[in-house]
Regions:
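Conserved Rossmann-fold NAD(P)-dependent oxidoreductase catalytic core, especially the SDR/UDP-sugar
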Residues: 1-34, 58
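Active-site Tyr-X1-5-Lys
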Residues: 5-8, 32-63, 84-89
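Conserved beta-loop-beta element that borders a ligand/cofactor-binding pocket
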Residues: 14, 18-19, 45-69, 94, ...
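Glycine-rich "substrate-gating" loop/helix at the edge of Rossmann-like oxidoreductase active sites
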Residues: 32-35, 63-77, 97-108
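Alpha-helical substrate-binding/gating segment
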Residues: 65, 81-94, 102-128
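C-terminal "lid/loop" region of Rossmann-like NAD(P)-dependent oxidoreductases
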Residues: 98-100, 126-127, 135-141, 146-165
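Non-catalytic, hydrophobic alpha-helical segments
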Residues: 111, 115, 129, 140, ...
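Amphipathic terminal alpha-helices
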Residues: 176-196
Length: 196
């Protein structure tokens, strides 16, 4: 709430990072995790700020962003970052069971392009930046031509990537990334096969 208050007092437009996790399963997935629940409630609060105070914002839904300088270890690590880290350390790639969970992956360059677009406009819009193709986590792991280690299934795990359509009374404007995950991984493997 401190960020909302600061923007409101200083008449600053907020670019808010939303999550598609809160929209999955026709909105029922918002209670799957504290993260999805909090993001969902913040969107409701933003809508009210707009109605009450003419608050300016743009909301962007991100889908598994990957690319240079991504986080590769720890709780905030990206799927692609974890796989790259394990590949470089010659460790089996960890895949949470069953592995058929599907996700959409978006390169950071495509993401930045949409963020810049949102910053320039002044329309109180909801935008999503994603890729048209989704992959199962197991499919992604197999792109690395590496050994795979299955981990136990996690509570609150989503099985499909929710493509955003409508949030509250807002249309979501879709932007599709141009950079292909297969090519990205292929380039990563070529680059590091020369080093190893």
């Amino acid at each position: 709430n401190a960020v909302f208050d600061f923007c409101l007092k200083n008449k600053i437009k907020l670019i808010y990072s939303a999550t598609s996790a809160s929209l999955g399963n026709k909105g029922k997935d918002k209670n799957l995790s504290p993260y999805a629940f909090t993001k969902s409630k913040n969107l409701e609060f933003l809508e009210n700020l707009r109605k009450w105070f003419n608050f300016k914002y743009e909301v962007i839904y991100f889908y598994n962003v990957y690319g240079p300088n991504q986080i590769c270890t720890g709780k905030m690590a990206t799927v692609i970052g974890i796989f790259e880290d394990h590949y470089l350390k010659k460790k089996p790639l960890p895949v949470v069971r069953p592995g058929s969970q599907s996700r959409r992956f978006t390169h950071i360059d495509d993401t930045i392009e949409v963020c810049f677009k949102a910053w320039k406009q002044n329309k109180n819009r909801h935008l999503s930046v994603t890729n048209k193709k989704s992959f199962s986590i197991l499919e992604v792991a197999k792109l690395f031509n590496s050994k795979i280690k299955f981990l136990p299934q996690r509570k609150g795990e989503r099985f499909a990537s929710a493509l955003t359509k409508i949030n509250n009374s807002n249309k979501i404007y879709k932007h599709y990334g141009k950079i292909n995950l297969n090519n990205y991984v292929k380039n990563f493997l070529q680059k590091h096969s020369k080093i190893n």
